């Protein structure tokens, strides 16, 4: 029992110590990313041909991105007044993208923002 308590104290101290080493910029960046994943940030995503310098596609709105580097694709999910729209965009040697945050975000640099979604945590239970 003493070993378990000692291990828990050491693990807790390590987590607390490592979290104290985080810079304000890292905390703000993490909070902006979480806000964007909750469709709170207005973004502009542009896909372009690196050889011809031509824009291929532009997506603007409250969008969340998920880069899948193994499959060389980018998933863009956007919230609109009519619902959710999702785009799958392939990347190649000559097609790339950049993303900009259109508006400023009011996020904290003092603490992490954690969002729990009950529907993701609790299973859907059917009673018969």
From Swiss-Prot:
It comes from the Viruses. This is Gene 64 protein. The gene is 64.
């Amino acid at each position: 029992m003493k070993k378990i308590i000692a291990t828990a104290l050491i693990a807790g101290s390590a987590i607390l110590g490592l979290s104290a080493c985080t810079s304000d910029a890292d905390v703000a960046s993490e909070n902006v990313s979480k806000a964007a994943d909750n469709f709170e940030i207005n973004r502009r995503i542009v896909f372009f041909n690196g050889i011809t310098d031509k824009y291929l596609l532009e997506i603007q709105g409250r969008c969340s991105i998920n880069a899948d580097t193994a499959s060389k694709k980018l998933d863009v999910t956007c919230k609109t007044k009519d619902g959710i729209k999702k785009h799958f965009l392939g990347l190649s040697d000559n097609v790339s993208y950049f993303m900009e945050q259109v508006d400023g975000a009011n996020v904290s640099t003092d603490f992490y923002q954690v969002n729990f979604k009950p529907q993701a945590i609790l299973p859907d239970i059917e009673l018969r």
